[in-house]
Swiss-Prot record:
This is Protein zwilch homolog. Keywords: Cell cycle, Cell division, Centromere, Chromosome, Kinetochore, Mitosis. InterPro entries: Zwilch. It is found in: Chromosome, Centromere, Kinetochore. Component of the RZZ complex composed of kntc1/rod, zw10 and zwilch. One of its GO terms (cellular component) is RZZ complex. It holds the Pfam family Zwilch. Essential component of the mitotic checkpoint, which prevents cells from prematurely exiting mitosis. Required for the assembly of the dynein-dynactin and mad1-mad2 complexes onto kinetochores. GO terms for biological process: cell division; mitotic spindle assembly checkpoint signaling. Disulfide bonds: none annotated. Gene3D superfamilies: 1.10.287.1880, 1.20.58.730, 2.20.25.230, 6.10.140.520, 6.20.270.10. Belongs to the ZWILCH family.
Amino acid sequence: MWAERHRAAVELQQFLSSIYEQVKKGESLGPFQYKDDVQVHVVCDGHCKPLENFCSGSEVLYIMEKKPLTLEDNALDETENNEGISFYMSLQESPQPQAIPTMSARQFLTSYTLTHNPNMIQLNSGVPVKVLPPLWVRCDSSDAEGTCWLGAEPIKSNRNEITGMSFRTVTCAGPTADKSTFPSLDSLRQAHKERHYSSAMQTRGFAQYDLFGSNTVENSVIESQSSVTVDFVWNGVERILQLPPLTSAATLNIKVESGDLRSPVYSVYKELDFLLVLAEGLKTGVTEWPETSETKSAVDLVQHLLNDLKNKVDGLSTSVSKKDNEKIKSDTAAVDCSIQSFITERGDLDFAEMLWCKMRKSVSSYQDVVNCFSLVIQSLKHGEMHPWIHRGSSSTLSKLIQESYHGDMQSLSLTGLTPMRMLLEIGLDKMKKDYINCFIGQDLATFNYLDYFICTSVDLQEQVQRVKKLHHMLEVVVVCNAFLSLGHENLFPLTQSCLKYYKENPWNEQHVFQLPIRPSVISTFYQNSHPQTWRVEIISGHGQKEVKTTWQLTSRRPVDHVSFAVPDVPIDMTISGDNEELVYYPTQVSCSQVHFC
């Protein structure tokens, strides 16, 4: 019996060492098949969401599980019924993680522990024990406690020598809305004391609230693509589901995706979207023209703009008509009047910017672009107008206008990609100024901080990418200003965080920006709401001998490989009233240690 256990331990150690080396060399990412129907993943910290609340934050870890069902493993009868067809279709989709029987999982952890015990000379042949990453095993909750995860992690000394093993057991039940079934904090403390013989204990609380799920912003413009949650951490927990005290450390987690139809900056997004269409057309040679929002043709609108400027030269008009000017302003920043606008309208649009505003909503073909620029160039050549442009503008059209001041315009052929490039250039110039006006106008950034994003020394495609970054930053800041009513003291550090991230990273709307904040600033958003996650940690011991018992409630299923009995109430309740209760999954993480010497 012992010989068999030793052999199993050596085989596991050799397998885990081998796949770890493969991953380090970049040869494979797995999963790696072990015996029979068991497979192992090697994952990096932060890449295993199911374990984010349970593991201790190791850089690399193993996850062992049962190999998922596949079409190859499950040939179906030709005479399958509807249920069989449904099963067949489910196999074609991404396979769900499968759990290992809890008893088998314990045996794997036993083998893992044996290989790390320096006293087991017969296993390591006198060679120093090689420390492997932590091992976590998905369990099927087949035991009485409902164990869904088992984990083991070597305890190392300051000299990187193995002195013991730390074990974690994760049990889960639920879902339930019956709070009377939750243990009291005193009973959890007592259980921890009896398990670890601890006299000195401390408690630490954690709670996460979904601010867009609260009554304050119900029916707001933010949909599921965007989320703002707040994490609270505090010491000295008083009771289960305690409201985070105002002395808690609070952090906002902000993820915003552009394109919400009712966003305060949706009109700016649409303008950017057209810019992206042009950039893609320049890159591929094929342009997917969006539907126009103007009833008049692009040529008519541009001709009307030129006529106004001609009349100004002839002294018949002192400015572009008031009606058109107001329309251009509204194009720049159309904001829901029910929400105080964060965007300030620009009143200093030059000719190129006004031309962009006309063309972006009316051109529907390459020929439209050519015809519009032909009208402009002819008017400039004949001296019919002398439009003003912003100093420093580097677009092709701006250079032509500057040359027209001296009656010495260079010849320009509107063929090939030139017209598309000219339109993209004036759009980039205009939008850069819009974003500068916003961030500098709100004292959120200086010109020097924004210089990277508006630089013209890089190619057009890179300029477009940087403008996309500016827009995402704007969306993030606007959400916090419009819906959380955050003031300058919070928006300024948030903007600086966004600027720093986007100077070093590519555009990524899935990135979660974090902002430390005083709980009192956002108290109205969470004090009458239910937490999405609530957790208490009971801690005793110090350093390597620290042990912890964690008990938590989550509104979402905490593990993806175990099925739970569903109660009569909906699992994903929407909190829209004070009398509604949230359904929770109770989870407990227990810790134990074994010391080898």
